[in-house]
Each structure stands twice: as C-alpha cells, then as structure tokens.
C-alpha cells in the first residue's frame, strides 16, 4: 500500500510539473523565449554593419531583408529574400502574433521593411545607407511573425 501511494504521489508530481511547463510555454516562457534571446544576441553583434541594397552578408553589407534572412538562417529558418515575399509568408506555418504577445526574436514586417523585435519596444534592422544596421524604437504598426517557437 505504501509503495502504491508513493507511485501515485510521483505520478501527481510529474503531472503538476508538466502542467507548469505547459503554462510557462503558453505565457511566453520556456524554449521559445530562450531561443528568442539567442536570436537577439546573435542579431545585435551585427550592429554597425553597412547597408547595401540587395546585400546578403555582414562582410559586404546587406539590406533589411538580407539581414533578417541571414540571422534566421543561422537558426535553421528560411525567410523570403524580398519584403513582398512576406505577403505570402504566412506560408511555412509561421504564426502571426498580436503586438501584445510579441517576444524578443519575433520577425517584424512592414510594407518595404523587416526587422527583429529585441524587447522593450525596440528592434534591430538594416535601415538605409546612412544608418546601416542598428537598434531603434518600434515605429508604426508592423506585423509580428513568430519564426521560432
């Protein structure tokens, strides 16, 4: 009887731990936020890279889509090479999330521009030839895409 009670208690503890893990994941914690932090850290190391229209890498420069494509490719995710491609991007199962649920690491899309949400109403992007790649406040009303998680 004691062994059965102990086994039942262990099963209840496992179920409670699993429920807590699922609740944390639904609240934006867990692995998706950990990967989001990795995406942000990786993207931030490219601050200062020059803007080159049509560019695709940090050594020769990139445009906004080249930057986001390069960063997400590092994490094994494919993204379009043109901003217009995001109109059909709701392909591949990427999830559109409301601004109230955005998380660091989410891709941001505006007509003609993309960036990566870094948290605290900030994002990093390749802007233009005079600004290059830098982190700035979120502007306008972008679409947020959950690429990972």
What do these predicted regions represent?
Residues 27-149:
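Peptidoglycan cell-wall recognition and remodeling modules
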